């Protein structure tokens, strides 16, 4: 029995059972208030005029891209600029055609400079072509070391550094190249007179492979504009397109914010994180393209509900209550609400409403089968939350072998990846869902990136408030390691997980590339948000700036 999507939500909980001993996280409230409700207006006639201008500029850039030109180096520069400025989604087939031609007929010249060779390698790998990394032997000396003369070529070093982040297992030369370029680029940042110093600092913090394309585009506008050889039509296209898309995203977030405000979780469930804006930012990193508007809406609602459920299990619920909630989700029936404590009813009813909305839309499209996979993914999520709650109840610190299978599920990345497919239209088939339920390597790798990066930055806060043991505590107990040295053990598994992700994105792929991109982008979001802190839970200046640049401030034309 499915829940009807209409109806009134239950009244606020009058009693959150203060007499029961409960943990408290003291999460700070949302910093955004009702700001995004003000973006409810539709597109204007001025926007229609801008759209026409964008179409004209797109045709101009398309002609440049497809022009017969034997200068492949110039084509590489053009493609790189298109991608880094965030408008590659307009030219996907054209870019693939050009790069496929380069891959099929590529003969790497020993005379090619390190900048061009690295750029070619990166763009081809990014497109899924398994170009050999042996070409980088051309830049080694007779003793097998990278030539020291390369260190003076900062532009070339930066290009090689970016290329190394596409490495897969067994490519030792790229591991060496990463260490070599990192050392020399760090040295270059000490010379502020270097015109590339700002780019180098940014790249060392956020390499292209791990960055969010739209966020990186916002950064790259000024870099590209400062280049005297920049293409004026391409830059204008990128800026106009960014601003038009930003208006679309603002309208979407306005609608989602209104839905969230109506739920009133900030008052009904004050122990939980109020982070719907941050949730939308997260999902915008998964797909920003206009055709995925429905996918963004439902995935944002699902991740927002998951955040509330996570806090019920982590922060507020007793084990007996959590058992009841787990059983209710297993039943997935509105009648199960009667067995729940009052505060849980608000969440449970809202959860079923969200999936009812998905069900209605999928029924219209003749894709109702997708709802089964989305529900099962959420059920798996809640089961894993309950397993962790049982560990906490008895103060159990599991071994890493016991912890990771459960913690990879509670990272929510398998569930989010599954749900991200639901609204993707014709790009996804039943086989796509069967594939993700087979626990493919790329999904596991994305979850490893999420879990370990989260645990590295969040474990101290979690232990203060009485949270289930993180990977840090599990490793410390199992290996007798100190709290200071344990976090140093996790960057390597994260690096290996990124190699798995890169490997799974090489042709022939198990599923079409648009599907893999959702999983890749989920890993990218984690790298951006959790690099030095939990930017989701403890909202700081960095994430505030990211949200502002993507969702509030337009690009100056």
Swiss-Prot record:
Binds 3 Mg(2+) ions per subunit. The keyword Metal-binding applies. Mg(2+) 1 binds at residues 310, 314. GO terms for molecular function: germacradienol synthase activity; germacrene-D synthase activity; magnesium ion binding. The keyword Lipid metabolism does not apply. It holds the Pfam family Terpene_synth. One of its GO terms (biological process) is diterpenoid biosynthetic process. InterPro entries: Isoprenoid_synthase_dom_sf, Terpene_cyclase-like_1_C, Terpene_cyclase_plant_C1, Terpene_synth_N, Terpene_synth_N_sf, Terpene_synthase-like, Terpene_synthase_metal-bd, Terpenoid_cyclase/PrenylTrfase. CDD domains: Terpene_cyclase_plant_C1. SUPFAM superfamilies: Terpenoid cyclases/Protein prenyltransferases, Terpenoid synthases. Involved in the biosynthesis of germacrene D. Can use farnesyl diphosphate as substrate, but not geranyl diphosphate or geranylgeranyl diphosphate. Produces mainly (-)-germacrene D along with gamma-cadinene. The Asp-Asp-Xaa-Xaa-Asp/Glu (DDXXD/E) motif is important for the catalytic activity, presumably through binding to Mg(2+). PANTHER family: (-)-GERMACRENE D SYNTHASE, OS04G0344100 PROTEIN-RELATED. This is (-)-germacrene D synthase. It comes from Vitis vinifera (Grape). The lineage of its organism: Eukaryota, Viridiplantae, Streptophyta, Embryophyta, Tracheophyta.
């Amino acid at each position: 029995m499915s829940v009807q999507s209409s109806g009134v939500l239950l009244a606020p909980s009058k009693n959150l059972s203060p007499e029961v001993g409960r943990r408290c996280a003291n999460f700070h409230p949302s910093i955004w208030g009702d700001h995004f409700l003000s973006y409810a207006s539709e597109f204007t006639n001025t926007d229609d005029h801008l759209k026409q201008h964008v179409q004209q500029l797109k045709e101009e850039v398309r002609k440049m891209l497809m022009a017969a030109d034997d200068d492949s180096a110039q084509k590489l520069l053009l493609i790189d600029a298109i991608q880094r400025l965030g408008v590659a989604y307009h030219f996907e087939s054209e870019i693939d055609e050009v790069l496929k031609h380069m891959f099929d007929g590529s003969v790497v010249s020993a005379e090619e400079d390190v900048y061009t060779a690295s750029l070619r390698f990166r763009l081809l790998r990014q497109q899924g072509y398994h170009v050999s990394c042996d070409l980088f032997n051309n830049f080694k000396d007779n003793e097998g070391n990278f030539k020291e003369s390369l260190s003076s070529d900062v532009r070339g070093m930066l290009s090689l550094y970016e290329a190394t982040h596409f490495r897969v297992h067994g490519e030792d030369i790229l591991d060496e190249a990463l260490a070599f370029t990192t050392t020399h680029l760090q040295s270059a940042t000490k010379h502020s007179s270097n015109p590339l110093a700002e780019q180098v600092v940014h790249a060392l913090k956020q390499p292209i492979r791990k960055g969010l394309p739209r966020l990186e585009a916002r950064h790259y506008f000024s870099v590209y504009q400062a280049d005297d050889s920049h293409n004026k039509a391409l830059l204008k296209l990128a800026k106009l397109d960014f601003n038009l898309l930003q208006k679309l995203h603002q309208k979407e977030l306005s609608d989602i914010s209104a839905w969230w405000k109506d739920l009133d979780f900030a008052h009904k469930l004050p122990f939980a994180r109020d982070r719907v804006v941050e949730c939308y930012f997260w999902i915008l990193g998964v797909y920003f393209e206009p055709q995925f508007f429905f996918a963004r809406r439902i995935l944002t609602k699902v991740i927002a509900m998951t955040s509330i459920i996570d806090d019920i299990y982590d922060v507020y619920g007793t084990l007996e209550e959590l058992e009841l909630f787990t059983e209710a989700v297993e039943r997935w029936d509105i009648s199960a609400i009667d067995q729940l404590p009052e505060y849980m009813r608000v969440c449970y009813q809202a959860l079923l409403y969200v999936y009812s909305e998905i069900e209605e839309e999928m029924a219209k499209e003749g894709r109702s089968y997708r709802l089964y996979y989305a529900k099962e993914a959420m059920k798996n999520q809640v089961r894993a939350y309950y397993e962790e709650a049982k560990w906490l109840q008895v103060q159990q610190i599991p071994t890493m072998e016991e912890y990771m299978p459960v913690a990879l599920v509670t990272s929510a990345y398998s569930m989010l990846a599954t749900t991200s497919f639901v609204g993707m239209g014709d790009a996804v088939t039943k086989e796509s869902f069967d594939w993700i339920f087979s626990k493919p390597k790329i999904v596991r790798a994305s979850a490893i990136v999420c879990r370990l990066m989260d645990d590295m930055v969040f474990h101290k806060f979690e232990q203060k408030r009485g949270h289930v043991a993180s990977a840090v505590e599990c490793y410390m107990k199992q290996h007798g390691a100190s709290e200071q040295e344990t976090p140093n053990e996790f960057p390597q598994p994260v690096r290996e997980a990124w190699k798995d992700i890169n490997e799974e994105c090489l042709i022939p792929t198990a599923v079409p590339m648009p599907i893999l991109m959702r999983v890749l982008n989920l890993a990218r979001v984690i790298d951006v948000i959790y690099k030095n802190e939990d930017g989701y839970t403890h909202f700081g200046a960095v994430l505030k700036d990211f949200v502002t640049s993507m969702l509030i401030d337009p690009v100056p034309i």
